[in-house]
Amino acid sequence: MAQTFTDTERAILRIVQKNLPDSATPYADIAEQTGTDEQTVLALLRRMKEEGSIRRFGASLKHQKAGYTHNAMVAWIVDKDTVDEVGRQAAEHRLISHVYYRPSTAPDWPYTLYTMIHGRHENEYLEVIDTLRKETALEEYAVLNSLKELKKTSMTYF
């Protein structure tokens, strides 16, 4: 069921979905900017976390600046009977940031599971591919190397 938000809650969410204020009291600053109090800000965020609308609250690392300069999307051929288990195994790897299942609709593209793997060097992400291949017995995959980042932003909802 879709949530409804008050104008104040939408204003709070507009701020927190971007960058928190660089301050010792970011939630008090948000409260001041939105005409409410710090407890209201914290209560909204706690409620949304408990409901599962907010998955986590934390810093976003720019992986290239942190030294993770090599990444690739790896597309795997996985049947739908094993996709949940294989997806769970892939998600356990610390260098895999995204795992998606998408049904194949193109006759010449049979891949259904997509993983985004990051490494400090090419061999690092190739090792993850090899490990996952051995753990899952998957043999058919395509490595789509990232050549250039054209856009990377977090989704803005409000």
UniProtKB/Swiss-Prot annotation:
One Gene Ontology term of the molecular function aspect: lyase activity
Assembly mode: Forms a heterodimer composed of AhbA and AhbB.
Protein family membership: Belongs to the Ahb/Nir family.
Biological function: Involved in siroheme-dependent heme b biosynthesis. Catalyzes the decarboxylation of siroheme into didecarboxysiroheme.
Domain of life where this protein originates: Bacteria
Catalytic function, reaction form: siroheme + 2 H(+) = 12,18-didecarboxysiroheme + 2 CO2
Pathway the protein contributes to: Porphyrin-containing compound metabolism; protoheme biosynthesis
UniProt keyword list: Heme biosynthesis, Lyase
Its EC number(s): 4.1.1.111
Protein name, UniProt field: Siroheme decarboxylase beta subunit
EC supergroup of this enzyme: lyase
Xref: InterPro entries: AhbB-like, AsnC_trans_reg2, HTH-Siroheme_Decarb, NirdL-like_HTH, Tscrpt_reg_AsnC-like, WH_DNA-bd_sf
Keyword Lyase: yes
UniProt lineage: Bacteria, Pseudomonadati, Thermodesulfobacteriota, Desulfovibrionia, Desulfovibrionales
GO biological-process terms attached to the record: heme biosynthetic process
SUPFAM superfamilies: Winged helix' DNA-binding domain (SSF46785)
Annotated source species: Oleidesulfovibrio alaskensis (strain ATCC BAA-1058 / DSM 17464 / G20)
Keyword set includes Lyase: yes
Gene: ahbB
Signal sequence bounds: none
